């Protein structure tokens, strides 16, 4: 239910968002805009006795001349509330690529780094019902499915920090009304009127839909309905994964007969989860590529998807890392390899972690005894000193070394139910 109500009702609504398990330290991301300024002031009223310690951060992207003064505005207001504040500067824009996407990534990276430095377990973001509705409209334009139309989750984990959106049930107008009634200043970002951006187009389209009874409230309710549908689909995908898969040296083995009886949507979700877990891609593969991989699986053909090989013949379908995806990946000894592998062993002079490769596998006389196929092992992690192979634990050449998944095998299943 959306709220367009008074100050105390807003405070009560926010307090209820944290009543089950309030964090000891709660970060608040405040840009200086009306939504986030209102969030900061309302949270300060939620916890007046300091039962939850609030910390405020402002990300200054350095892209507009006004950004420094907006950060200063937040700093002054935070100080007036007795809250610590830090401005986080982004200097990574090179003028190339997608500015909005890069700025968003930088913003979340800076916020989670700041939170971890300050022992802040949870960060509150000021997305509103209007943001949710606009997101849904934009995703409709991309032919999104259930997960896309669920729009923004009220809670998710990123880089070890919980991000919460306690204002998804609150309208932008309600927050502005609160600020005006309390005489609290905020800054208006001129880009909010720039129709070059899809979000602003969606905002204008939303206003045009109002005569049909389609407003932020209705669309936010649709997003909530889709979120519940997504949870159900995730649950049945989880059950299918438990029933049909097992982990083998970081690869996923899938029982083909059971997979071919799954409903199309569950099969698609399971495929995407396996590929994402192994390949670690930031974005899911394109729809056409997914459809081709599903067709190959159903017809017992091998294929490639998202940096993974799918070996489709035999009693078990094997999903493994694709050699080409890790061919040039080299990190120092002690670092995480391919975003998932931790290798431990004796210190090696000039030690490096690389993909084993065909040449390296020739130096592993017992690799066939592992039961893993050639294609999987050449993309497995190994330890090198210059041109000398030191160890390849998954290929039967341990030499005192182990290779383990950073998150453990159980993460494959647990991550199906976490957003």
Swiss-Prot record:
Belongs to the tRNA(Ile)-lysidine synthase family. ATP binds at residues 31-36. It comes from the Bacteria. PANTHER family: TRNA(ILE)-LYSIDINE SYNTHASE-RELATED. The N-terminal region contains the highly conserved SGGXDS motif, predicted to be a P-loop motif involved in ATP binding. The gene is tilS. It catalyses: cytidine(34) in tRNA(Ile2) + L-lysine + ATP = lysidine(34) in tRNA(Ile2) + AMP + diphosphate + H(+). GO terms for cellular component: cytoplasm. Ligates lysine onto the cytidine present at position 34 of the AUA codon-specific tRNA(Ile) that contains the anticodon CAU, in an ATP-dependent manner. Cytidine is converted to lysidine, thus changing the amino acid specificity of the tRNA from methionine to isoleucine. GO terms for molecular function: ATP binding; tRNA(Ile)-lysidine synthase activity. It is found in: Cytoplasm. It comes from Ruegeria pomeroyi (strain ATCC 700808 / DSM 15171 / DSS-3) (Silicibacter pomeroyi). InterPro entries: Rossmann-like_a/b/a_fold, TilS/TtcA_N, tRNA_Ile_lys_synt, tRNA_Ile_lys_synt_N. Transmembrane segments: none annotated. This is tRNA(Ile)-lysidine synthase. HAMAP family: tRNA_Ile_lys_synt. Its EC number is 6.3.4.19. CDD domains: TilS_N. Keywords: ATP-binding, Cytoplasm, Ligase, Nucleotide-binding, tRNA processing.
């Amino acid at each position: 239910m959306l709220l367009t109500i008074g100050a105390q009702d807003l405070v009560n609504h926010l307090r209820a968002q944290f009543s089950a398990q309030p964090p000891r330290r709660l970060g608040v991301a405040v840009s200086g805009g009306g939504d986030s300024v209102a969030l900061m002031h309302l949270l300060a009223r939620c916890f007046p006795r300091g039962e939850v310690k609030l910390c405020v951060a402002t990300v200054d992207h350095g892209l507009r001349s006004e950004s420094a003064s907006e950060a200063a505005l937040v700093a002054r207001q935070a100080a007036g509330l007795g809250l610590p504040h830090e401005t986080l500067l982004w200097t990574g824009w090179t003028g190339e690529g997608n500015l909005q996407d890069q700025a968003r990534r930088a913003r979340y990276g800076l916020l989670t780094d700041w939170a971890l430095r300050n022992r802040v377990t949870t960060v509150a973001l000021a997305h509103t019902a209007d943001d949710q509705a606009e997101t849904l409209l934009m995703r409709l334009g991309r032919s999104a499915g259930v997960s896309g139309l669920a729009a923004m989750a009220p809670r998710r984990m990123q880089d070890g920090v919980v991000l919460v959106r306690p204002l998804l049930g609150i309208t932008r107008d309600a927050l502005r009304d609160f600020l005006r009634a309390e005489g609290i200043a905020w800054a208006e970002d001129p880009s909010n009127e720039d129709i070059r951006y899809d979000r602003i187009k969606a905002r204008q389209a939303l206003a045009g839909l109002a005569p049909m009874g389609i407003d932020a409230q209705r669309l936010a309710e649709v997003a909530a309905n889709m979120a519940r549908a997504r949870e159900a689909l995730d649950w049945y995908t989880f059950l299918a994964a438990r029933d049909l898969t097992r982990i083998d040296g970081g690869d996923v083995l899938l029982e083909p007969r059971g997979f071919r009886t799954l409903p199309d949507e569950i099969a698609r979700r399971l495929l995407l989860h396996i590929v994402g877990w192994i390949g670690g891609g930031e974005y899911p593969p394109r729809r056409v590529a997914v459809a081709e991989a599903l067709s190959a699986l159903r017809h017992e053909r091998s294929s490639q998807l998202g940096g993974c090989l799918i070996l489709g013949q035999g009693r078990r379908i094997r999903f493994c890392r694709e050699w080409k995806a890790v061919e040039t990946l080299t990190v120092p000894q002690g670092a995480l390899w391919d975003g998932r592998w931790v290798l431990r062993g004796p210190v090696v002079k000039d030690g490096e972690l690389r993909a084993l490769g065909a040449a390296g596998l020739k130096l592993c006389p017992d690799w066939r005894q592992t039961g893993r196929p050639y294609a999987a092992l050449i993309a497995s992690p190994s330890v090198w000193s210059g041109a000398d192979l030191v160890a390849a634990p998954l290929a039967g050449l341990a030499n005192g070394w182990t290779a383990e998944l950073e998150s453990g095998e159980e993460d494959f299943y647990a991550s199906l139910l976490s957003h």
